[in-house]
Design a protein with these regions (language model features):
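Subtilisin-like peptidase catalytic core
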Residues: 16-94, 140-145, 180-191, 195, ...
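Subtilisin-like serine protease catalytic core
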Residues: 1-14, 22-67, 108, 132-136, ...
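Structured lumen-facing ectodomains of secretory-pathway proteins
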Residues: 126-308, 312, 322
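C-terminal membrane-anchoring or membrane-association module
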Residues: 597-611
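C-terminal subdomain of the subtilisin-like protease fold in secreted/lumenal serine endopeptidases
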Residues: 85-87, 138, 258-274, 348-425, ...
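Hydrolase catalytic cores
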Residues: 36-39, 55-61, 126-129, 210-212, ...
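Surface-exposed binding patches on compact interaction domains or structured appendages
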Residues: 399-401, 424-455, 506, 510-524, ...
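Short, solvent-exposed loop/turn segments enriched in Ser/Thr/Gly
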Residues: 411-418, 459-469, 499
Length: 611
């Protein structure tokens, strides 16, 4: 943190500077101070947990990159210092086993580890280590309840499009329902022979040639001068963009007259084709605080567990800055400390809670969130939902595990799993259990003592990944357990004899080859083998624990993926053979932010375009 910031200095206890190798980890970049303020500010701004003690560990000299060995040293030092919470975010779209092992070691020592998901969204599979660690609490970012939480919708006929309001666009009192018409590039001469009065204009970004610059503000001016009610600008290159109407090249007296939004090139071309037969459209711009930030990194990270775990406010967050100033900033970096502060309050109430119990409470008490069309966000984007601190604080039930993944097929149409429930020593009287989700899967349940047994059954043999939730009511509090159901066309059977696994492929019947990867879920050590209809291999597992089984089955030109988990109950009688390995040199990691509660921060910059 910034030792000159009066809102924070009283909260700093100790730490270490791994860059200069001294005991004064002064923040020179500003992000550590911003993150610390969200957790523990105690002045003009009040943090989530203003009375916590802050440990700070500096690992970056320039705020741009950090050697992974310093990250590991900082985590290990935090373990030595016996902190309660470590909050880290690393912007690496990769798995880093040594960092993950350091995180696991911290959790084994009873420390809760919170990881920001990263700022590489909205693309899928953009969460890296340590946020992809299954044991960490991974946090994505939502808007907040400020006026800046603006979203937009565009529906043409029955088709809903993803559109983003441009900077400078204002909320409208009522949706605009009218015809939509293609207006080329929305330049002045594009409206010479085009009547757009009372209509929404669809226009392409830029101009007819690559070097022609047409500001978004000019597109808005010409569309509104010709009587348009709204403007939709689609990209002239793949993907989405964040446009701004207010910029340095616009006149001081300019004020946008009509709502203006952006969309991807792909959807823009699709809409342009739709306009050949359907022109009835509705455009709306409104506040939606629980909308997931576009930059928030997404899963999936693994077929065996789901990330992120939950989301928290991370857009336009007002917090402390260097030299006793304040700053509004955005990033999953600033969503994570909201969760860290909440955890501090939970531990203050009940210091005996374990990291896994804390994680369960936060997941199962999260609020389900929806997009601008009132559709639930996918788990890969929003996890279980937005943190609900009040509900978490009043929670009286812990679920283990707090999420379920079922693997079904046309041959294995049902599966039963168990959730252990803990009511802090009280007897458990479940009032109600309900399920939401897909029509092709049905659920049933049974409560026995402190166990909740959930059975999923395939109704329609449709391959894919389907999302559901179980809603469990206890003592008038309704908890939720996210459920993923994966349906495949293939089936394997796992056989065990004295810690040795063998595999049989049941479907497809005419399979030719199967590659099987077995991963220790704690150490991430992988072993592989291959089998054919005439060649069988087995695999010895020496350590007790849960193993992830991934099977890739080839049949002619098709490939089928099958996933399962298997629990080895005891260690093998014989010792595991020692295999030598060559250590590879560590390379510096590019970081979007790393914050601890313990705090080191490097931020992310998010640029808008004005043409």
């Amino acid at each position: 943190p910034d030792f000159f910031n009066s809102d924070q200095i009283s909260r700093f206890l100790k730490g270490y500077d791994f860059v200069d190798n001294d005991s004064i980890p002064q923040d020179t970049n500003g992000h550590g101070t911003q993150v610390t303020g969200i957790i523990a500010a105690d002045g003009q701004l009040i943090g989530i947990a203003p009375k916590v003690e802050i440990f700070s560990y500096r690992v970056s000299s320039d705020g741009e990159s950090v050697p992974s060995d310093l990250i590991i040293k900082a985590i290990n030092r935090a373990v030595e210092d016996r902190v309660d919470i470590i909050n880290i975010s690393l912007g690496v779209n990769m798995t880093h086993a040594k960092i993950d092992n350091a995180v696991n070691n911290a959790i084994d020592h009873g420390i809760v580890v919170v990881a920001a998901a990263g700022n590489s969204g909205p693309d899928k599979s953009t969460i890296g280590s340590p946020a992809r660690n299954p044991n960490a609490i991974t946090v994505g970012a939502t808007y907040n309840n400020r006026d800046s939480s603006m979203v937009s919708t565009l529906q043409v006929g029955e088709t809903q499009f993803q559109v983003l309001p441009m900077l400078g666009t204002n909320i409208i009192s009522d949706p605009i329902s009218t015809d939509i018409i293609f207006g080329k590039y929305s330049r002045e001469n594009d409206f010479d022979d085009l009547d757009v009065r009372g209509k929404i204009v669809l226009a392409e970004r830029g101009g007819e040639t690559p070097d022609e610059i047409v500001f978004f503000s000019d597109k808005e001016i010409f569309a509104s001068k010709n009587g348009a009610k709204g403007l939709v600008v689609y990209n002239n290159q793949p993907g989405i963009f964040f446009g701004e109407l207010i910029h340095e090249y616009v006149s001081e007296d300019y004020y946008p007259s009509i709502p203006t939004v952006s969309m991807t090139r792909e959807e823009g071309l699709e809409l342009k084709k739709i306009l050949e037969s359907e022109t009835s459209a509705t455009l709306n711009v409104f506040n939606h605080p629980d909308f997931i930030a576009t930059f928030s990194a997404r899963g999936p990270v693994s077929p065996f567990y789901q990330k992120p775990d939950l989301v928290a406010p991370g857009v336009f967050v007002n917090t402390t800055s260097l030299k006793n100033f304040y700053n509004i900033t955005s990033g999953t970096s600033y969503a994570a400390p909201h969760v860290s502060g909440a955890i501090a309050l939970l531990l203050e109430k009940n210091p005996e809670l374990t990291p896994h119990e804390i994680k369960s409470i936060l997941i199962t008490t999260s609020d389900v969130i929806t997009d601008q069309y009132k559709k639930e966000f996918e788990f890969d984007a929003g996890g279980a939902g937005r943190i609900d601190l009040k509900k978490a604080f009043n929670s009286e039930l812990i679920f283990d595990p707090p999420k379920l993944i079922f693997n079904l097929s046309g041959q294995e149409i049902s599966e039963r799993q168990v959730i252990k429930m803990n009511a802090f020593g009280d007897s458990i009287n479940i009032q109600k259990v309900e399920f939401s989700g897909e029509d092709n899967v049905e659920f049933d349940y049974e409560v026995k003592d402190s166990s909740l047994y959930i059975t999923s059954k395939l109704i329609e043999n449709k391959s894919g990944v389907f999302e559901s939730r179980a809603f469990i009511t206890y003592n008038d509090i309704t908890y939720q357990v996210p459920i993923i159901v994966r349906v495949t066309e293939a089936t394997i059977v796992i056989l065990e004899k004295e810690n040795e696994l063998s595999f049989q492929v049941k479907r497809p019947i005419d399979w030719e080859y199967a590659k099987i990867t077995v991963t220790n879920s704690e150490t991430y050590e992988e072993q592989t083998l291959s089998i054919t209809p005439t060649k069988f291999e087995s695999l010895k597992l020496y350590e007790a624990g849960r193993y992830w089984i991934e099977t890739n089955i080839k049949n002619n030109e098709e490939t089928f993926d099958v996933y399962d988990v298997y629990d080895i109950k005891t260690d093998a009688k014989e010792k595991k053979p020692i295999v030598s390995s060559t250590e590879l040199p560590e390379r510096a990691l590019i970081i979007l932010i790393i914050i601890f509660s313990i705090v080191i921060v490097v931020g992310f910059k998010f640029r808008r375009k004005n043409y």
